[in-house]
Structures are given as structure tokens and as C-alpha cells.
């Protein structure tokens, strides 16, 4: 199987023969040349992106399911097998103050997922109390978070993951696309504050993990959870 076959399968035929082994992102904008991000640098490919090509990618990414496609457009992305993500941008449609989808799609950002493995035995000595992972965007916070979750789970801890955007687990109908360990329970689709509280009540965890803490209500929920004897593992943006 070619590298990132799950992504190649949804691309137009003219792009399926290209080598994406070093790619981090593929950006497709209507009327512009495709752009590939590799090792932090962007390079342009030949040819221009046509509107029908973006629609075709979304149809293939959702297995030609109209319901799945509409759901993807409401949340702004679709997750592929392997944990890859197709982000959507265009002319949004709103109803009662909430975005319900897109009238037209003008851009796609395809993010290439890599399940990078770190030395779990080296991580465990630092995971005795609650832990906050800080770093700049793209610094690898989520990769380190996954490794910590896996290390704790493999060591016998009961870990619950509040994965509001699905970026930690890359959950699909086939289950989590990233290995998070044998004793890990994943909640997707819920806001972090409500989701973490639900996990505390329902799943009897010893650890609760979440990605990208940004809102005050998330911090308030974490404070309340900390009073219940459960340890917390989270990430947040910070300057280098």
C-alpha cells in the first residue's frame, strides 16, 4: 500500500500518483494551484483546482453518504481512516445563529496524520500528578498527549479522554484511529467542560485528558474535578 493510501483514495486521479510521503498538509483552493506543506515549507503543484474536485473529495471522504457529508459540513471537517482530517472552508450557511453547513466549498485543508511513538517508559516517571503540556502551534503537543495517555493506560490507569474535536483519537465509525491504550475510554462531540464532568460521573477514571484548554469554563471544570481525586492531563498553547 502507498504511503497515506487513505488520502490518495479520496483525491482526484491527477493527484493520486504524487508522492506525499513527507507531506504535512495538502491545501486545495478553487482556482489556485494545489499546495503541499513539507517540513514546514510550502511548495506548489501544477494545475489549478476546479470546484467539482472539492465536491468529489468530500463525497469520497464520506463514502457518498449525503447524511455523513452534511454532518461533516456542519462541523467543518471529516476524519478519514488513519486519523487524517479534511478541513472545509467556503460560504457558510447559518440558522438561528448557528452554522449549519456550507452553500459552496472553496477550500480544503487535508492534514496528514502520523501516529508517532515515543518512549512510554521515559514518560511514566513524570506522570505522577496532574500535568499541563505547553507549546506553540505545531510543536507536537497532541502527539505527546497521546503518548502520555497510552503510557498511563498501558500501566493500568483508567484514562478517560474528552476529545471534543476528535483530534486525539481520530474517532470514526470503526473506532479510534490512534492507539490510546487498553484502559482508555473516549468521549467525542461534547464540549470539554461538560464532557469532562460527564466522564467523572459516569466512568470512574483515575485520569481525565483533554486537548487545547482555552475557555474559562474548561478551567473551572478541571478545578472541580481536581477536588475529586482525579488527575488531569491537558495541553494549552504557549510561546516557545
How does the language model describe each region?
Residues 203-240:
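Conserved P-loop NTPase nucleotide-binding/switch module
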Residues 133:
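Hydrophobic anchor at the beta1->P-loop junction of P-loop NTPases
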